[in-house]
C-alpha cells in the first residue's frame, strides 16, 4: 500500500523540457513541493548541472547549494530539488550572475541572463482575488504568493510587478487588447505577441487571439496568457528569437543563411 507522497521520478517520466537523456540513469530528480507544479518547473539541480554546467554530479550541486551561494527570488535556497519556475530570478552572488527563467519558442526554459537592475523585480500573473478574514482583500499569484491589500484596480489575469526585496507590488499591467503577452502553456508555449481580442465563453474557456511581431496570429486559452508589458514594450528581457516561432522551412533558411555568411 502506498503511504504518503511519491518520492521518486523515473527518467522517462520526467518532463520533456528538462532535456534529460534516457541512458544516463534510471531516475531523475523529483522536484520538492513548492510554488510551481512538477510539470512546469525546473529543479535547481537540473539548472546548475545540465544547463549552466557548473557541476558534473548531483553531489557537486549539493556542495554548491549548501554553501548558500544560490538565491531564488532573493531568498537563499539550499534544497537541490527546489522547483524554480516561470519568471523566477536565480542569482549566484559568487559569480555576480542573475538569470530569469522564461520559455523559448520550443517550450523549454531558456538560460536568460539579466542585469542587476532587472533582477530586483519579477512579474506575477494574478490567479485569484479573494476577501479574507475581517474583510481584508487578498490576491494570489501564479507562483503562490499571497499579497494583502492590493490596489483595487488589479483584477484576475492582470500582471503585477513585485519588488523581490520587500515582496510588495510596485506596478501592474492590465489584461487588455494591445498589450504584449507570453504564452505559458499549450501548443503555443513560449510565443510572444500582442493581444488582438478576447472571446468570452461563459461556462467554458475564454479564448484569446494573439498576433506576433511577424504578423502570424494564433489563439489560446486565457489561462495560458501572461501579460509581460504595456503596449508592445515588454518589461522583461526576452530570450533569443524574441518569442517568434519560425516554421521548419524558415528555420532551415535561417540556418543556411548563417552557414553561407560564416562560410
UniProtKB/Swiss-Prot annotation:
The keyword Transmembrane does not apply. Belongs to the eukaryotic ribosomal protein eS4 family. Keywords: Ribonucleoprotein, Ribosomal protein, RNA-binding, rRNA-binding. It holds the Pfam family 40S_S4_C. The lineage of its organism: Eukaryota, Metazoa, Chordata, Craniata, Vertebrata. This is Small ribosomal subunit protein eS4. PROSITE patterns: RIBOSOMAL_S4E (PS00528), S4 (PS50889). GO terms for molecular function: rRNA binding; structural constituent of ribosome. Coiled coil: none annotated.
Amino acid at each position: 500500500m502506498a503511504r504518503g507522497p511519491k518520492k521518486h521520478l523515473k527518467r522517462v517520466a520526467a518532463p520533456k523540457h528538462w532535456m534529460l537523456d534516457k541512458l544516463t540513469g534510471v531516475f531523475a530528480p523529483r522536484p520538492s513541493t513548492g510554488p510551481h507544479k512538477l510539470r512546469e518547473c525546473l529543479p535547481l539541480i537540473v539548472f546548475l548541472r545540465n544547463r549552466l554546467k557548473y557541476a558534473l554530479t548531483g553531489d557537486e550541486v549539493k556542495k554548491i547549494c549548501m554553501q548558500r551561494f544560490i538565491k531564488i527570488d532573493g531568498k537563499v535556497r539550499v534544497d537541490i530539488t527546489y522547483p524554480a519556475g516561470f519568471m523566477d530570478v536565480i542569482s549566484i552572488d559568487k559569480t555576480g550572475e542573475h538569470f530569469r527563467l522564461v520559455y523559448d519558442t520550443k517550450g523549454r526554459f531558456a538560460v536568460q541572463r539579466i542585469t542587476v537592475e532587472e533582477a530586483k523585480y519579477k512579474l506575477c500573473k494574478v490567479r485569484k482575488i479573494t476577501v479574507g478574514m475581517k474583510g481584508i482583500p487578498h490576491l494570489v499569484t501564479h507562483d503562490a504568493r499571497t499579497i494583502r491589500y492590493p490596489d483595487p484596480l488589479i483584477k484576475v489575469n492582470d500582471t503585477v510587478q513585485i519588488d523581490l526585496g520587500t515582496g510588495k507590488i510596485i506596478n501592474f499591467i492590465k489584461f487588455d487588447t494591445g498589450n504584449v503577452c507570453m504564452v505559458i502553456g499549450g501548443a503555443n508555449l513560449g510565443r510572444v505577441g500582442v493581444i488582438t481580442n478576447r472571446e468570452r465563453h461563459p461556462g467554458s474557456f475564454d479564448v484569446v487571439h494573439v498576433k506576433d511581431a511577424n504578423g502570424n496570429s494564433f489563439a489560446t486559452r486565457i489561462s495560458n496568457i501572461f501579460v509581460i508589458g504595456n503596449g508592445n514594450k515588454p518589461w522583461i528581457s526576452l530570450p533569443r528569437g524574441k518569442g517568434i516561432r519560425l516554421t521548419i522551412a524558415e528555420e532551415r533558411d535561417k540556418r543556411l543563411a548563417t552557414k553561407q555568411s560564416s562560410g
